[in-house]
């Protein structure tokens, strides 16, 4: 009799552990951005992700990688959308950042640049985030989007990245020399 109750107790205890393992998981995805030249030496890229209804309750961490050869300035924006109903927020974006990383080890180099949450107050607003970074050096970079799928219909987010080259120091020297020549000619005309 004692053996039966001991076995039954062990069965219930193991069932409790099995029940705890069925919890929300983190969905992690990494993909390279497809860039398009903008005709002015920089480039643009679009990024995003869609989550099925079965992922409701899960958190996510999406990483979008890109490489830049020279110094650059960047700006990015991110919004979420309603998939299931316009009355219930489907995604909750909790973080948006840009960082430089080592492609061999995937380690972050230096500090990440955090995005700004521009989401308006109210009931179930659409997420809106922005990010700006200036004077960054060339190398491998990544945009990271963190969040949680809260709607019963899944969810989606999308964003844009714009990269503009930073002028080389020689360009500033030529600019100053040109302004000096213009100033000299203007002064010469005034005295003549």
Q: What is each model feature region?
A:
Residues 2-26, 158-186, 191-192:
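Short, threonine-centered small-residue motifs that mark membrane-proximal processing/anchoring sites
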């Amino acid at each position: 009799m004692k053996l039966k109750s001991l076995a039954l107790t062990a069965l219930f205890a193991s069932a409790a552990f099995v029940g705890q393992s069925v919890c929300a998981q983190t969905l992690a995805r990494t993909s390279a951005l497809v860039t398009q030249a903008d005709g002015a030496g920089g480039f643009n890229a679009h990024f995003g992700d869609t989550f099925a209804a079965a992922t409701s309750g899960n958190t996510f961490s999406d990483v979008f990688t890109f490489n830049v050869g020279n110094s650059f300035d960047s700006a990015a924006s991110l919004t979420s959308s309603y998939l299931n109903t316009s009355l219930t927020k489907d995604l909750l974006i909790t973080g948006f950042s840009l960082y430089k990383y080592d492609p061999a080890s995937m380690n972050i180099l230096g500090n990440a640049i955090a995005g700004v949450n521009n989401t308006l107050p109210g009931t179930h607003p659409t997420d809106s985030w922005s990010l700006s970074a200036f004077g960054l050096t060339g190398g491998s970079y990544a945009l990271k989007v963190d969040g949680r799928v809260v709607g019963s219909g899944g969810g989606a987010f999308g964003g844009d990245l714009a990269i503009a080259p930073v002028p080389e120091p020689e360009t500033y020297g030529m600019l100053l020399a040109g302004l000096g020549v213009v100033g000299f000619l203007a002064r010469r005309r005034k005295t003549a």
